[in-house]
Amino acid sequence: MADLQFTKGQGTGNDFVLFADPAGEIDLTDTQVQALCDRHFGIGADGTIRAVLSTRIPEGRAALEEDPDAEWFMDYRNVDGSPAEMCGNGIRVFTLFLIENGLIELPPGRTIPIGTRAGVRDVQRSGSGFQVDLGRWELAGGEPLVRAKDLQVARPGLGIDVGNPHVVVALSSEDELAEADLAFVPQLDPEPAAGANVELVVPADPLVVDGVGHITMRVHERGSGETLSCGTGAAAAALATRHWAGAAAPHQWRVQLPGGALGVRMFPTEDGEHVGLSGPAELVFDGVVALA
């Protein structure tokens, strides 16, 4: 039985077990990930994040082909042990973990490329947290019908890919949002081959205040269940709401989640429109746990 040195971290309540494995020698099994994330018998988290040098794993070497400066790879695993392409909250916490453990230097205002399964993502440190360029996004997956427990009827969703798949559903009121039971997996028809995260969204009234759009959302994350926050989900929800609102909709958004607020902005680049995410990150405590 080996010991694992870990750090518990969170971003707007989306929490993670992080550990450094520069040489790529600690390949957790699905069962070990599940045990670490168990909130009753383990540490408790929405997922695990391994900090591994990009040169030491195949996915990292692919990231280096995209950007030779992407020295570190974020190996994210969901509660069930399945790998995730990207985590918008996790990458902010991951970057803070690298800084606090002396693995990188990143003064405020500077940017660092991080390897992920969705490709390289640029992270900038700010005075109050981190901003992440999530890259290009696209409408993907059509408009599947979504059935969630305690919602009276099936609703049309909008498929959006921001490096990982999402289906966003608009609801009419915060009361309706509160009634949905996301402890159960929402049913999608048709079901995406790789599954999807599902966001339930309520636009604010008024929608836009001082040029910023406002929405409230909850999320069921594929492989993890309902979480207090999902960064890529917040981006997908803002993109979907802008799509529904039409050409006059803003490109700056404030997304309120159970765990706190995140900022989303859309901006043009040479290779098309990108979406950015901003929010806080915190390292909560360090510890050592025995791996079964």
From Swiss-Prot:
Which pathway is this protein engaged in?
Answer: Amino-acid biosynthesis; L-lysine biosynthesis via DAP pathway; DL-2,6-diaminopimelate from LL-2,6-diaminopimelate: step 1/1
Tell me the subunit arrangement: Homodimer.
Q: What is this protein called?
A: Diaminopimelate epimerase
The EC number of this protein is: 5.1.1.7
Annotated GO biological processes are: lysine biosynthetic process via diaminopimelate
Q: Which family does it belong to?
A: Belongs to the diaminopimelate epimerase family.
**Keywords tagged on the record:** Amino-acid biosynthesis, Cytoplasm, Isomerase, Lysine biosynthesis
Which Cys-Cys disulphide bridges does the record give? none
GO CC terms: cytosol
Q: Which InterPro entries match?
A: DAP_epimerase_AS, DAP_epimerase_DapF
The protein's annotated catalytic reaction(s) are:
(2S,6S)-2,6-diaminopimelate = meso-2,6-diaminopimelate
Can you name one GO molecular function term for this protein?
A: diaminopimelate epimerase activity
Tell me which residues bind substrate: N14, N78, G88, N89, N164, N197, E221, R222, G231, T232
**Site annotation (Could be important to modulate the pK values of the two catalytic cysteine residues): which residues?**
H166, E221
> So where's the catalytic machinery, residue-wise?
C87, C230
The protein's location, in the record's own words, is: Cytoplasm
Uppermost EC category? isomerase
Task: Outline what the protein does.
Answer: Catalyzes the stereoinversion of LL-2,6-diaminopimelate (L,L-DAP) to meso-diaminopimelate (meso-DAP), a precursor of L-lysine and an essential component of the bacterial peptidoglycan.
